[in-house]
Design a protein with these regions (language model features):
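Conserved active-site alpha-helix within GNAT-family acetyltransferase domains
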Residues: 98, 123-141
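Conserved acetyl-CoA pyrophosphate-binding loop and the N-cap/start of the following alpha-helix
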Residues: 91, 95-103
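Terminal substrate-recognition subdomain of acyl/acetyltransferases
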Residues: 110, 134, 143-149
Length: 149
């Protein structure tokens, strides 16, 4: 049975490994492991940055994602951004992300302080886009731009 819960610091090695695998698989990027470790640690050390959600099959960590926060002055609420999603290949197409998304949606609605959930996806990742659309997410309203340093 799959269990969805907030991650704890003991999950750090698996989350780092997931991030390295995800970047290579989806964007053909080889990330610097110590930098990713530092980034994951920063979230656990500063809850204001966000939190990690994980899925477990028994004691095995099978998926993780990170939630970061955006303040919406239009809604006077926080918007949760889903980032860094990874599901182990052998658990894909089994509804793991749907369970995680349902957990997040429930928590967000119940909080009264969250105005919505957003995510971004690489335009080339057609499989992920299909999953998000099947969950009722709308990818047509905004275009995402970035300037990274």
């Amino acid at each position: 049975m799959i269990k969805i819960e907030q991650a704890n610091v003991e999950d750090t090695p698996a989350i780092v490994a997931f991030q390295l695998a995800m970047a290579l698989e989806t964007e053909e990027l080889r990330l610097d492991p110590p930098m990713v470790q530092q980034g994951v640690n920063a979230v656990f050390n500063d809850p204001g940055k966000g939190f990690y959600l994980v899925a477990r099959d028994g004691n095995k960590l099978i998926s993780s994602l990170m939630i970061t926060y955006e303040w919406s002055d239009w809604r006077a609420k926080t918007v949760w951004w889903i980032q860094s999603l990874y599901v182990l290949p052998e658990y894909r197409q089994q509804g793991v992300f749907r369970q995680m998304f349902d957990w997040l949606s429930h928590q967000a609605r119940e909080s009264g302080t969250v105005g919505g959930i957003r995510l971004y996806v690489d335009n080339r990742n057609l499989n992920a886009r299909a999953v998000y659309e099947a969950l009722g997410m709308d990818g047509e309203h905004y275009r995402f731009y970035e300037l990274m340093f």
